[in-house]
């Protein structure tokens, strides 16, 4: 007997798949670091996250690897959030407000496979 409450595993990628399927044309609006507004739909987000996941795989990122992001909260970081976790890697977010020495220590301590950044 299957005692699970859901018919599918509760994965981060499942959240985005659901949003794309049921709310694909719904607009996501965020403010960029530069100050202007960025608009995209859930379908756009899902497509960009899949492309990024493929790029991560092409760069040697495998299931269970650790990938760090050093980025402000925004649409680029959200795309990385879904791409990294959707590819089966572990996302480690680094705070851009940390002192550079703290970032270096964190990166060396976590044994990252691939650090990624947006313009910080």
Question: Where are the model-predicted features located?
Answer:
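A short N-terminal helical cap/helix-turn-helix that marks the beginning
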Residues: 7-29, 47
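Conserved AMP-binding/adenylate-forming core of the ANL superfamily
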Residues: 28-82, 99-104
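Short alpha-helix at the nucleotide-sugar/activated-sugar donor binding site of glycosyltransferases
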Residues: 85
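Structured binding elements
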Residues: 88
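Short beta->alpha connector loops at strand-helix junctions that form conserved
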Residues: 94-96
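Conserved small/polar residues in nucleotide/adenosyl-binding loops
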Residues: 110-116
